[in-house]
Amino acid sequence: TRTPVNVTVTGAAGQIGYALLFRIASGHLLG
């Protein structure tokens, strides 16, 4: 069974990963 804590941690990791990916993509676009 999935626990709220596990979902929260996964969600936080997803947000951080998405933000990091977006920042890296912006860096490549800007050069």
From Swiss-Prot:
Reaction catalysed by this enzyme: (S)-malate + NAD(+) = oxaloacetate + NADH + H(+)
Family annotation (Gene3D superfamilies): NAD(P)-binding Rossmann-like Domain (3.40.50.720)
A single GO BP: tricarboxylic acid cycle
EC number(s) given by UniProt: 1.1.1.37
Class of this enzyme: oxidoreductase
InterPro entries, sorted: NAD(P)-bd_dom_sf
Keywords recorded for this protein, A-Z: NAD, Oxidoreductase, Tricarboxylic acid cycle
Amino acids binding NAD(+): 11-17
Any one GO molecular-function label of the UniProt entry: L-malate dehydrogenase (NAD+) activity
Described purpose of this protein according to its UniProt entry: Catalyzes the reversible oxidation of malate to oxaloacetate.
Family in the record: Belongs to the LDH/MDH superfamily. MDH type 2 family.
Record's protein name: Malate dehydrogenase
